[in-house]
Amino acid sequence: MASTTPITMEDLQKALEAQSRALRAELAAGASQSRRPRPPRQRDSSTSGDDSGRDSGGPRRRRGNRGRGQRRDWSRAPPPPEERQETRSQTPAPKPSRAPPQQPQPPRMQTGRGGSAPRPELGPPTNPFQAAVARGLRPPLHDPDTEAPTEACVTSWLWSEGEGAVFYRVDLHFTNLGTPPLDEDGRWDPALMYNPCGPEPPAHVVRAYNQPAGDVRGVWGKGERTYAEQDFRVGGTRWHRLLRMPVRGLDGDSAPLPPHTTERIETRSARHPWRIRFGAPQAFLAGLLLATVAVGTARAGLQPRADMAAPPTLPQPPCAHGQHYGHHHHQLPFLGHDGHHGGTLRVGQHYRNASDVLPGHWLQGGWGCYNLSDWHQGTHVCHTKHMDFWCVEHDRPPPATPTPLTTAANSTTAATPATAPAPCHAGLNDSCGGFLSGCGPMRLRHGADTRCGRLICGLSTTAQYPPTRFGCAMRWGLPPWELVVLTARPEDGWTCRGVPAHPGARCPELVSPMGRATCSPASALWLATANALSLDHALAAFVLLVPWVLIFMVCRRACRRRGAAAALTAVVLQGYNPPAYGEEAFTYLCTAPGCATQAPVPVRLAGVRFESKIVDGGCFAPWDLEATGACICEIPTDVSCEGLGAWVPAAPCARIWNGTQRACTFWAVNAYSSGGYAQLASYFNPGGSYYKQYHPTACEVEPAFGHSDAACWGFPTDTVMSVFALASYVQHPHKTVRVKFHTETRTVWQLSVAGVSCNVTTEHPFCNTPHGQLEVQVPPDPGDLVEYIMNYTGNQQSRWGLGSPNCHGPDWASPVCQRHSPDCSRLVGATPERPRLRLVDADDPLLRTAPGPGEVWVTPVIGSQARKCGLHIRAGPYGHATVEMPEWIHAHTTSDPWHPPGPLGLKFKTVRPVALPRTLAPPRNVRVTGCYQCGTPALVEGLAPGGGNCHLTVNGEDLGAVPPGKFVTAALLNTPPPYQVSCGGESDRATARVIDPAAQSFTGVVYGTHTTAVSETRQTWAEWAAAHWWQLTLGAICALPLAGLLACCAKCLYYLRGAIAPR
């Protein structure tokens, strides 16, 4: 009896599970019989009990695990494995009666006494609560009889055309038990799948969700998720529905879909049966793209290909050349003839030898006039005050019989015909204003170069070259094509077998530091990738059209229905939370290592380094101006290094005596009698001819009456004194300069942001820290650098030149543009002119100034004993040979290549507001070093006041903002000292050590043709359109798909607005 055995919780649970299994079998059998009659067949004893208990007249039950009467929520506590393996109960259950199929009825509930009772009839579900009551309790996540994987909660979407772009999101439980059954009218009722697990939607959304519909407009799939798109009407309002569907059924077969009435996609895969497929329109667009590429390739034909050509420079109209040069412009480019170093120049109305007019170091190298056509013409460039000066000159026609001149590489006498050689004229007419000091033609860069420099002076402009252009020509032999040089820009460095390329040259392949150029069709495809945007490569159409075509195809497939916005949000954008920042703070940080600021967290510059590729440029020995001398309290009889050995050091005297362009002078100061000779004034007449009769010497002998002889004190009544000075340019054995080229440089800034270290560059200027994101306004990389490693008597230091030198322009005479030797034995440049010696008294006001170029001042100094005097020697700049001296390197280079012209800008994105003040107090200890109006930035250093950023101004010129503390910046100064500096308020005087612009001017000479930068153009719109027809055609082709794409994106954005933030 039941009274003798107590009922435990395990027994009750097993009973409930058995009743649940029986009820599920009853519901499944009743639902099948209500939809279609089962054919009569023989049943075995295991299933006859279940069929005998069915009630054919009961209400129709729906298949599935909804409303099965179980009391336990299996989603929280699944049954143990041994309980799931129990056999089904063989107790016959009452057969449910069948009901009319017009209205679904609520399921029966199993009672504790073994009977069943219907739930109260609630009619069609109008809210989530009624829908849940109509289905029974929430189904489990796992079916007790299977091990099929399920998902806890999935998302479906609904939207109505009557409500605009308002999307409703429905979160519901979804079990992988197969597709719900169809109603008798063939419609698919999703109400069986409605079991909300998120916020309850409004009642009209639930009614629309439960509305049966059999039309499927499209299928969306991604990964293991599949969505079916439907549209239908509810009460006259058109609704759209995006439902999550199962991928596979329990039996392993693909779950069948409802019948499609609008579109059916047949693409299948082993894992995901429903995918998106591109059809005929996309194939047509791809074919059109390939046809465009084929047509463009056929148009290009055989064209030269260069993997990295020089940047193009469009020639300007010759409106600034003058009337006498314009008629030659159509003949460019052209080749010149060599000149020789012994030519003549016309200055004013007189002709003078070049050696009398040009600086001395022009005479040693090869140079010549440039012959345009029937006139001798030339161009002369001088750089000063941030600009270049040039003009074009012409003189009388050459003689009727041309005469070959000496080559640039060989300055010796060449073979000449019977006629006299034509002088190299570079006439200077009145428009040039006479000969400019320090200007002259250029030495040739390469021995096989048949061109020569041109004399330039006068008008203000900047010289340029036409861009390098190539052509292709066929020839007999292998390879059957060769490259023809149409125009060549020398700084591009194109060479053919080691010889510079000239206009008209033919070569199978050209090589330059930037790459290779060839006409080979085999390399055209690969080389066209680098030049994809040029006019001659049809690959430009491919590069420009492919992204738009791909975006158009994707957006066309995604935006063809209004459900695309919801599909994209559900499949792609769901769960994405973009970062947001509250406030931004901006400040500056100086570029010296160790600088710190508050932005608002502490930011410190830990260090700066740069990375580059190094190419060795050789080594050279610079010229060195060396001088020595002696002050003697008598007149020597042997004026030489041997005769003056007691007063003059032997080693430097011998080195200077054996140098080039030596200057040697001997002065007799107030001499009256010495050694028994009557020293009269005529004895030291100018030139010293009378003195040399008795004392032969190689030095110039000059009297110095009127100079102070107080250096030789002790004999006031019989005072005699002489001064000897010797100077020349020598090659010092312990002074060398090695050149290294740095390319592809990249500056790396090492920052510490509130203790977090990070590196920023121009490619990645961000630091992501726990306090926020720091964006650094990094100055541009310095580009190419030239390093001069100077070793002067054991003291080695490095100087840096910014940028690649323009060896055919302003930097023609810099040491880096010369050919060096690995053993540092070659001297740079030509032999300089001889220095000038001058005797100056100790109280002469002239000593308050500096010696001029190429001058050496000697001054006697009173000794500590009687008849013992010394000599003070001061040497000025090196005159015309300045660019070949160590001081030129110091003036045109810097000691720190990583120093940018201004501070670093810091933009810190944080969640709290930060406001940094601006100070108006003047900066302190400001020092300006460098030059003004010379094209080289001057260095400005100082100490900015605290309290905020300082907007630094120098003589009214804004140099940008600097942070508080020590700052170092650079700027082009256009005004001479004194300099007034301020931060926007009170100003202060800055100390300055600047050089006059005349001391920083240098000469540059150009090769070949040159054009000028003008402020206007004579090109019409028709000419511009004819020159850019390929770009205009390509733009018109891209405009049509771009317009359609923009319209498609606008439609997508309208519906995406509500899909991202659904109700």
From Swiss-Prot:
Chain spans, region Human C1QBP/SF2P32-binding: 30-69
Extracellular side: 301-534, 583-1028, 1050-1063
Protein modification: Structural polyprotein: Specific enzymatic cleavages in vivo yield mature proteins. Two signal peptidase-mediated cleavages within the polyprotein produce the structural proteins capsid, E2, and E1. The E2 signal peptide remains attached to the C-terminus of the capsid protein after cleavage by the signal peptidase. Another signal peptide at E2 C-terminus directs E1 to the ER, with a similar mechanism.
Cysteine disulfide links: C153-C197, C590-C595, C619-C824, C641-C653, C699-C712, C758-C767, C807-C817, C931-C934, C950-C983
Modified residues (Phosphoserine): S46
Superkingdom of origin organism: Viruses
Keyword annotations: Calcium, Capsid protein, Clathrin-mediated endocytosis of virus by host, Disulfide bond, Fusion of virus membrane with host endosomal membrane, Fusion of virus membrane with host membrane, Glycoprotein, Host cytoplasm, Host Golgi apparatus, Host membrane, Host mitochondrion, Host-virus interaction, Lipoprotein, Membrane, Metal-binding, Palmitate, Phosphoprotein, RNA-binding, T=4 icosahedral capsid protein, Transmembrane, Transmembrane helix, Viral attachment to host cell, Viral envelope protein, Viral penetration into host cytoplasm, Virion, Virus endocytosis by host, Virus entry into host cell
One of the GO BP terms on file: fusion of virus membrane with host endosome membrane
Residue ranges annotated as Cytoplasmic topological domain: 556-582
Residues where Ca(2+) binds: N670, A671, D718, T719
Cellular component aspect of the GO annotation: host cell Golgi membrane; host cell mitochondrion; membrane; T=4 icosahedral viral capsid; viral envelope; viral nucleocapsid; virion membrane
Glycosylation sites: N353, N371, N410, N429, N658, N759, N791, T1011, T1012
GO MF annotation terms: metal ion binding; RNA binding
Span list, region Disordered: 1-131
Basic and acidic residues: compositionally biased ranges: 70-87
Region (Functions as E2 signal peptide), start-end ranges: 279-300
Pro residues: compositionally biased ranges: 93-107
Site residues by UniProt (Cleavage): A300, G301, G582, E583
UniProt-annotated stretches for the region Functions as E1 signal peptide: 563-582
Bias (Basic residues) ranges: 59-69
Record field: transmembrane: 535-555, 1029-1049
Extra remark beyond the main annotation: Structural polyprotein: Translated from a subgenomic RNA synthesized during togaviruses replication.
Domain notes: Structural polyprotein: Contains two internal signal peptides that are necessary for directing translocation of the glycoproteins into the lumen of the endoplasmic reticulum.
Name the record gives this protein: Structural polyprotein
Species of the source: Rubella virus (strain Therien) (RUBV)
Lineage of source species: Viruses, Riboviria, Orthornavirae, Kitrinoviricota, Alsuviricetes
